[in-house]
């Protein structure tokens, strides 16, 4: 994927950034419209070097199986599962596309990017155990959460989670929601395969090239200004469509584009850190993604988790996140990123968040004050016998949370992702963080439908081959869910027991 020497002047599609979002959109377009030319510009010298890198993101295969922030408790003690169902539906779409891509040779060797790992919710204390029981009662009978277990027996806990059981005082009640069918996704490896496919099929890749400006032309195309960061060479590229998949850098470019849809948006950067286990014996004692419950008043990003990862076919173990603060919008960004993002059209939104999100400010202050002993103290809630010498602190990627205008409040902080697309469909971008990468496919399908409404009608047949459930809520169609689940499990090598054949799956879906 070396740089091209010839200066390119025209292309059909420009992808800004070589992360999971651009890679997904590019791979979709390659399948749907192979005659369109695609040029990808990445400011760094490698694919997936920012938030898509496996050590820079949580990589949970976000499907709301274990993340408690998606299942808030109501005042009457019941649990609201709407967000969890929505996130899981989105992950099923991504999973289907990955399976299709494996069948088509777009992706190879699934175990390089996806592996089966149980997803587990963990709480302690009588009140929290009661909540987790209510969560189980709300989810266990649901199509998308079938097989979930509720565990409150110390012996069973100890058998399944020996690292977490060692040294634990079980006089304090514990409870688990255990989902055996969870996955770990290495989005770095996945992105590299998708970008490789785009390159092999004629897409042009420019690394060390930074997009510095975007100007719309009278024919609705865009003039994209690009600088080679190594040589200083500047070039302009004229493109019919631009996708800004630049992670934390997307806000700046969308602002520079001048589209009205980007006005009022702001970004709040939060840096992340994790403790990474360096003791192979401890890593071998834990094989699950275990998510806890955020402290009262703490933001969703603070949910602690002891997280098995599979990176480069090797298991690893992380605990965190610990929050920090930096004005940079990218891990390898600039300290001027935050102040440079403040504009007349979003300053009220930014100031509004400063007033309304005092809980976040308090959380960040407490996190910044933590030393090594404080971080190990947090870890011991999960692994009571944890010792500092077995863990190292690593810096993860920057998370830029979306700030959006809100009537009467100035602005509110949104913990999610938002697709921003121009009314004429000529440019789109993605803002925000979690659940992020796990919902890349539905997010990019949204981009396609909003930006190419005419072409989208003609693409529906092909899209149904890629995502058999497209246009259908699996929640309402258990039979279809069973088919696509069995098919994708087999193709992605997640179910060694085997499953039904894939050929008839797409044929069972009604026209969307």
Swiss-Prot record:
Catalytic activity: (S)-malate + a quinone = a quinol + oxaloacetate
EC assignment: 1.1.5.4
Biological process, per Gene Ontology: tricarboxylic acid cycle
InterPro entries: FAD/NAD-bd_sf, MQO
Database matches in SUPFAM superfamilies: FAD/NAD(P)-binding domain
GO molecular function, one term: 2-hydroxyglutarate dehydrogenase activity
Organism: Rhodococcus erythropolis (strain PR4 / NBRC 100887)
NCBIfam families, per database record: mal_quin_oxido, PRK05257.1-1, PRK05257.1-4, PRK05257.2-1, PRK05257.3-1, PRK05257.3-2, PRK13339.1
Similarity comment: Belongs to the MQO family.
Protein name per the record: Probable malate:quinone oxidoreductase
Keywords: FAD, Flavoprotein, Oxidoreductase, Tricarboxylic acid cycle
Cofactor: FAD
């Amino acid at each position: 994927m070396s740089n091209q020497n010839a200066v390119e002047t025209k292309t059909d599609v420009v992808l800004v950034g070589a992360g999971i979002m651009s890679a997904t959109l590019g791979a979709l377009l390659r399948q749907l419209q192979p005659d369109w030319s695609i040029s990808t510009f990445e400011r760094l010298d490698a694919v997936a070097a920012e938030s898509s890198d496996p050590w820079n993101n949580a990589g949970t295969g976000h499907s709301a199986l274990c993340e408690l922030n998606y299942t808030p408790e109501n005042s009457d003690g019941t649990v609201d599962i709407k967000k969890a169902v929505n996130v899981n539906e989105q992950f099923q779409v991504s999973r289907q596309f990955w399976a299709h891509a494996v069948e088509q040779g777009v992706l190879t060797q699934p175990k390089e990017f996806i592996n089966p790992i149980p997803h587990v919710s963990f709480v302690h204390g009588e009140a929290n155990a009661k909540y987790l029981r209510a969560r189980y009662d709300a989810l266990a009978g649901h199509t998308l959460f079938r097989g979930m277990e509720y565990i409150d027996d110390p012996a069973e806990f100890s058998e399944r989670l020996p690292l977490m059981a060692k040294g634990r005082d079980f006089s304090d009640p514990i409870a688990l929601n255990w989902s055996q069918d969870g996955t770990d996704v290495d989005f770095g490896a996945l992105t590299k395969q998708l970008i490789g496919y785009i390159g092999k099929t004629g897409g042009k890749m420019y690394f060390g090239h930074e997009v510095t400006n975007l100007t719309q032309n009278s024919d609705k195309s865009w003039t994209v200004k690009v600088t080679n960061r190594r040589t200083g060479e500047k070039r302009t590229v004229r493109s019919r469509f631009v996708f800004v998949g630049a992670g934390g850098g997307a806000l700046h470019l969308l602002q520079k584009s001048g589209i009205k849809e980007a006005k009022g948006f702001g970004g709040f950067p939060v840096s992340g850190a994790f403790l990474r286990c360096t003791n192979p014996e401890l890593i071998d004692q834990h094989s699950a993604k275990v998510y806890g419950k955020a402290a009262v008043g703490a933001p969703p990003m603070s949910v602690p988790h002891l997280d098995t990862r599979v990176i480069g076919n090797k298991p690893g173990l992380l605990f965190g996140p610990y929050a920090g603060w930096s004005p940079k919008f990218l891990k390898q960004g600039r300290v001027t990123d935050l102040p440079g993002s403040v504009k007349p059209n979003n300053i009220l939104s930014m100031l509004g968040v400063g007033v309304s999100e005092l809980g976040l400010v308090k959380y960040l202050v407490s996190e910044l004050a933590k030393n090594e002993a404080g971080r190990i103290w947090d870890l011991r809630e999960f692994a009571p016998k944890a010792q500092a010498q077995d863990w190292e602190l690593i810096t993860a990627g920057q998370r830029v949370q979306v700030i959006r205008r809100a009537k009467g409040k100035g602005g509110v902080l949104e913990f999610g992702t938002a697709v921003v697309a121009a009314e004429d469909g000529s440019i789109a971008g993605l803002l925000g963080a979690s659940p992020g990468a796990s919902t890349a496919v539905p997010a990019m399908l949204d981009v396609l439908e909003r930006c190419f409404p005419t072409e989208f009608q003609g693409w529906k047949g092909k899209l149904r081959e890629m995502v058999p459930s497209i246009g259908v809520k699996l929640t309402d169609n258990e039979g279809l869910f069973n088919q696509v689940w069995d098919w994708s499990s087999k193709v992605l090598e997640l179910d060694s027991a085997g499953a039904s054949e894939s050929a008839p799956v797409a044929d069972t879906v009604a026209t969307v």
